[in-house]
Amino acid sequence: MRNQKKSFRSAAPVWAAFVVPIIWLAVLMAGCYEPGMTIFTLMDAFSAATKNPFSLHWTTYTPKFIGIFLLLYGGAILFYYTGQKNTRPGEEHGSASWGSVRELDKKYRDKDAGKNVILTQHLQMSMNGKMHRRNLLQIIVGGSGSGKTRFLAKPNLMLANASFIVTDPKGEMLRAIGNLFLEEGYVLRVFDLIDPSKSDCYNPFCYIRKDADVFKLIDNFIKNTTPKGAKSNDPFWEKSETALDAALMLYLLHEAPVEDQNMETILYMIENGGAKEEDDDYQSPLDLLFEALEEEQPDHIAVRQYHIFKQAAGKTAKSILVSAAVRLASFTLPEIQRITASDDMELGKLGERKQAIFCIIPDSNDASLNFLVGMLYTQAFQELYYQADKVHQGALPVPVRLMFDEFANVALPDGYARLQATMRSRNIMSTIILQNISQLKALFKDDWEGIIGNADSFVYLGGNEQSTHKYISELLGKETIDTRTSSQSKGRNGSFSQNFQQTGRELMTPDEVRRLDNKNAIVLIRGEKPVIDEKYDILKHPNIHRTEDGGAPPYLHTPLRAFAADDLSFPIENIDDIEILEEFT
């Protein structure tokens, strides 16, 4: 019924145009009518009148004839639409079909070559979302060796058309593109967890604007340092640990000088918070520190959080302290102490100038330090949203693009699906790079479909994971095809017959998805037909000669703060604001 109404509305001008000739015929026939005429004599008279069609006469019968003709005309239209069936010839079992790469590129590519996002060799999308009303959130799926870095990540970085935060396994992209960024006037920062001696510094304390940010950071820290697959039926331990960490962090934020606000100091405070199982009344140096603060400020938020922790008995409190210390064990490493003691990242300036931050992580199973990158991303989102909403009252002046290579290796903040749905209005875009759909399901058990749904571009580069093949096949949909069946019987009265019918078929079956040519990629853009195109040839990039892939020297990073032995002998015992710990030890 809805289709019929839509069809009538679209054809209404045509039906209305025929009203004039209908009235003309009625007037012409009314002029031929005389009382006592049979239908045959009337038709003969009407036939003669048509030889002089503009000889019209108004008679007493003219209004009646006009009414009858219009009534018959309306009845004919009604009969036409009520007799229609809801048919879609050729689409009975599905309407999926392949689109044209050329037409899509013409629709989505910006005339300014530097203001696009590269999808494939012949398909690019403008960074101006108002032009095509699509967001610039992308999901890239491809197995090992499918070219996720070479055919998508690198070419887009080489455009140098935004600020970037890049997850860079092995540091491959930094070496290849770092010099190009410097030539383009970028501020370049590196957070290197493979070789911290070549890393710039990142201190989480520098991006805490309000007390609530402390709890967000601790929540991300605990989740990032909890082994995958580990489950606790009792949330008591994590909540108690959160209260302890929050108390220490809030104490440093409100009471300690800036140079002492770092994760190493928190670990030092925990080491001085020992509890005795047999003596619940024992007071550690840390207890005395908070007792002194309570005497001055009884309602201090750090004191209140510490009281929550101290509700645990001696044995339980000791277990909480041990658990908290184990999570912070990485900060006993001198090189980690150095790169987290101060801050060079300037996350808040990413949306105000061209800046690139490369987070270099191991591509092996060693993810022991990756929690630091997770914390950095959590605070980057907070800082970028603050700058967009409070400072610029809307969108950031410089677009910021988050390039999540090996997305599964770094845990993002809780509620990332909500962030993904709101970042576009702030001129923030993200590219999630996965090996298969299973990785996304493991990370976001309840929200994985929403994360894919929020991204208007989906690129599949090939792979060998079965559930991904099935998912891509379902995304592509079904088409309607013609089938032919034949039968033959032999013998004296043998016969042969053929039947033609239609049936539905996947545009690509899971097996065909698996066998996708390694040089091709499948691209799905919201509201468009899927297309297959060649992967981008990095050697044809206009800036290739300025990168390591094009023969230029590799970029070698020198940290802003030179790594010296003196940096490792930080005299924690001389911290003025917490020297009371030493006095009570």
Predicted regions and their residues:
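Basic- and hydrophobic-enriched, low-structure N-terminal and domain-boundary segments
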Residues: M1-S146, R150-P155, S489-K490, E583-F584
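P-loop NTPase motor domains
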Residues: R134-I428, L443, T503, D511-K535, ...
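A broad, low-specificity signal for short, low-complexity segments enriched in glycine/proline
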Residues: A96-D105, G114-K115, L119-K130, R150-F151, ...
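Conserved ATP-driven motor cores of ASCE-family P-loop NTPases powering translocation/secretion/packaging/pilus
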Residues: Q420-I522
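Short alpha-helical interface patches
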Residues: A45-A49, P63-K115, D211-F221, Y268-N272, ...
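General secondary-structure edge motif
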Residues: G94-W98, T120, H132, L136-L137, ...
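A short glycine-/small-residue-rich loop at the edge of a beta-strand within enzyme catalytic domains
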Residues: D105-K107, F371, F407, G463
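Short linear interaction motif-like sites in intrinsically disordered regions of transcription factors
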Residues: A16, L25, T59, G99, ...
